[in-house]
Amino acid sequence: MEYKSTLNMTKSGFPMRAGLPKREPEMLKHWEELDLYNELLKKNEGKPLFNLHDGPPFSNGALHMGHALNKSIKDFITRSYAMRGYYTPYIPGWDNHGMPIESAIIKQNKLNHKAMSVAEFRSACHEFADHYIDVQRDGFKRMGVVGDWEHPYKTMDPGFEAQEVRVFGKMYQNGHIYKGLKPVYWCAHDETALAGAEIEYKDDPCTTVYVKFPMNDDLGKLSHLDRSKLFFVIWTTTIWTLPGNLAIALHPDESYAVVKAPNGEMYIMAEALIEKVMGIGGFDSYEVVEIHPGCFYENMLASHPFLPKTSRLVLADYVTMDSGTGCVHTAPGFGADDYETCKRYGMEMVVPVDDQGRHTDYAGKYAGMLTDESNSIILEDMKKDGTLFASEEIVHSYPHCWRCKNPIIFRATPQWFCSVDSFKDEAIAACNDVRWVPAWGKDRMRSMILERTDWCISRQRRWGLPIPVFYCKDCGKPICTPESIEAVATLFEKEGSNAWFDMAAEDILPKGFTCPHCGASAGFEKETDTLDGWFDSGSTHFAAMERDQGFWPSTMYMEGLDQYRGWFQSSLLVAVGALGRGAPFKECLTHGWTVDGEGKAMHKSLGNGMDPAEIFEKYGADLLRLWAGSSDYHVDVRCSDEIFKQLSQNYLKFRNTCKFCLDNLVNFDPNDLVKPEEMLPLDKWAVTRLNDLITKVFAWYDNYEFHSVSHAINDFCVVELSSFYFDILKDRLYCDEADGPERRSAQTALFLILDAMTRMFAPILAFTCDEVWLAMPHRAEDDGRNVLFNEMVQPYTQYALSQEEMENWGRIASLRSAVNGALEQARADKIIGKSLEAAVSLTVPQEDAFLTRMSEEALADLFIVSQVSLTVGDEVSVRVKAAAGVKCGRCWKVLHSVASVGEHEALCPRCAAVMAKLPKME
């Protein structure tokens, strides 16, 4: 007789094959119809606030894996807090101004931007930025990121621009903004100043030179020496800066020697570096004539090696003895330290390079040459005229523009600066009130602020927020008053910042406005520079978050490691310097870079990149989310097709676990769970293991350790459930009475496991967990519309086993491994086929004597054999033989109790009882 139809092998309709690329868009449509984001806010309104303020990506290209990692982690955070009872508004944002947008449209559209009017060019930039906002928004939505996508903030929106103008005004009135001539990073290709956060360092080959500066005036201190043969020797890696040399810096307390070479020339250099420098110069022998401290040479004059001018000997504590000659080439137009040193000595500022990176007339015969072009020519000229002491080829780390990738120069130009020194202590103190994840972020931020120089906030670009400063034509002084700032802000709110370029200064300023410096009532000009994009993004907490949401500070900022010198820092400086507040975030979390499978940076040119859009189509967004959720993102995160293939296997284990639960919960009513005292010990073991997982998952979500959540749930599915619990449970689920107490005990445990696991994994596997949620039965208090509307469950302590009982179950699991090993050997020896054909004789030591309290039938179920005999002895021993008896035609156990019952042949008592309650089979 065929008994298969009498087994409880129900099917839920939940498919084993995920088909995520096709299924996920359907889920997204369902979420949109549900108005998921707003419904979630309504549900949690009035609860504690968790506000993750979105760091705005540039709207200048399609999604890349860095975007995918970043937005996935943010979504994990907001979803996990929402499911733990928090109100979680999430307003995405975009950074729109600046060189990345300008460069992209010029390159893509081959625009002659210099021939375009400001209005035309800014319109093209605006259109370009809007397009990529749409592209990126569609990608983020496809990933399942929940947020207010219809109302994002944009740094180019009029309301934002107006608030940023007010931020600038506050910082100006606080005395932290000034205009000055100082060396800044300068990109000659793009003709603009750059911030430190816009610099990338690359290893470049370079020619370093040791140059002889003849003694000109020794102040009578070295008159006993032949001045015509006396030289200071300097060292530099930037030959093109030599025309700008005004001084030679020595350390006041270091010893400097006059070293005589065999050729009769005498060279002044640091005593500590004589052997190295003379060796580079090709001198095997030399004589140290005399030694003096660096301060001995102060205010002496040397002649420039190829220009008709002198260089003063000055003192500086920053001079080190680890490289060069100890005599430091000092050009105030090209270096911050150089500038400060020469300023201290009252020397003039000389900048012999123009905006395009060409030498000016000040450089003499090199005028008109690009700096790169002049290097080799100056070198050859010095070789010819004998001023070159030596040269070397080296590879050094040199700054490049982050956008055009060309080498940059350090060049003094008139710029607007934020004086960080004036509020540096307050900014550093503000770091103490932030939770940094990882914890070392605090020291990193504090040290960066401590070491930073003034912030250059002006840019010589057209696509940016105009610096809201006017100039009086009569007295020439800059004007930035509360009245002028509010006039500009009000104008921008109504018409946007393009109005600055379209209107005359008098039409922007209030009627009757007069110069606060000289009282002039007419003749004003507008500043032509725009603000640094980091000032834009650094103002988002005030110009977007506080303005639109009314929240300040945010609960969290979360971005990549590079933002310590970028968005984190600019936001902190704006908050302290402009608003007089502390940090604009309570927590600061960082992630690493995305790299390829070998740990290399991904670049189009290398062909090792991965496209999120292609991953959506091949694997589905949930696999992308699982990649982010399975990776320790505090370090660099690897991605490759092989990694995604492995993740697919992990995903299937979770999905199959859910399917097993769902299939066995058909017709189960979770409103009628068995009472704790009715649950069987094995089921309590499973729930207790679940409780342990729940406790750990809560802690991991608190610490943003999403990879721990993912790995633990995967291990729970594979080790505790599939390999142990489900394996043992199948007989009870399939063969017991459908509504019997033993099967309902198992179903109760399965429901608790599926319910808790689906909620716990929902922040990461958003699509799949919601698919499971829609397929599973629910309790009356559950919101069946979406898993996100339900909080994560607390441990089910009422069903938990004691610690002693759990230790006993640990011993059972160990014994089961021993039994399985013996069964495998018996199968290999042809003693048995399937494990139900086996009878096991098990000997256990005294510590396992608790097993004698269990029936041999229960032990047989645990080991998935037909018969077990148990004895207590000295050590574990397992013997396997073929079970004696008759095979039950329904459950396939081999038992002595199998017999014919009425019309049913060869049934065990359990199966016979079940059959007796079923309708009579035809």
Regions found by a protein language model. Name each.
Residues 184, 398, 467-469, 512, ...:
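Residues immediately within or flanking Cys/His clusters that coordinate Zn2+
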Residues 191, 460, 476, 519, ...:
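Cys/His-coordinated zinc-binding microdomains
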Residues 312, 345-357, 461-463, 482-636:
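Alpha-helical recognition segments enriched in aromatics with Gly/Pro capping
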Residues 247, 254-327, 336:
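Protease-associated
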Residues 42-103, 164, 234-242, 314-345, ...:
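N-terminal catalytic cores of NTP/NDP-binding nucleotidyl/phosphoryl-transfer enzymes
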Residues 95, 184, 188, 194-202, ...:
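Acidic, turn-prone loop/beta-hairpin segments
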Residues 2-20, 26, 30-34, 106-243, ...:
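Residue patterns forming the tRNA-binding/recognition surfaces of aminoacyl-tRNA synthetases
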Residues 187, 401, 472, 515-518, ...:
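Short cysteine-rich clusters marking metal-coordination/redox-active sites
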